[in-house]
Amino acid sequence: MIKKILTYCAEQLNSYLSRYYHRPQGLAEVGHIGQRTGEIPNKVIVSLVNVERETAGGISNNVQTYGGSFTSSSAPFLLNLKVMFATVFEEKQYAESLSVFSKALAFIQSQQKFMVDNVKYTLTLETVSTFDFHNIWTTMGGQYYPSVVCKLTGVVIDSNEIKSSGSTAQNTEVQT
């Protein structure tokens, strides 16, 4: 599911950027930002940088009753994804990367809510301190590119596996 959501974001961003820049190979893709070897892609790279569990929706077991029986399963994971949009361009194209980065920010601002497979997701800009950005980029290989981190909410991971089942009490009287 995570791959599908990030791919959708990259495809929509690519479609948006194609209004302003005409590149047959596109300008956005899902990828790993750090430790690049070889050719620089000259694109906006959409990359997952962190996953957080959302606890506001509750984390208790899911119990369902059916007549005189019940099933119990683990609560689904409600997740927030931290997604980085980075303009990974060659050094000589830095000015162009800033132009593309500005358009990418306009895309994020205009597409804060979207749907994939009838599930609604929200994409919001995160405020990341210079210190935290330094840590992120150091972890990913040290080469900095103009970038922003967004919080993507609405991701649910649910295995739908039943942990236990049983039957409910049929007699409510207590014998002594």
Where are these regions (language model features)?
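Small/polar-rich, solvent-exposed N-terminal microdomains that initiate assembly or binding
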Residues: 1-63
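A broadly used, surface-exposed interaction patch
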Residues: 55-85
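Short conserved micro-motifs at the rims of enzyme active sites and ligand-binding pockets
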Residues: 57-59, 160-163
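"Short basic amphipathic alpha-helical interaction patches in structured regions
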Residues: 60-65, 95-103, 119-120
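Short, cationic low-complexity segments
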Residues: 69-76, 165-176
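Oligomerization/assembly interface segments of phage tail-like spikes and tubes
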Residues: 73-90, 102, 145-154
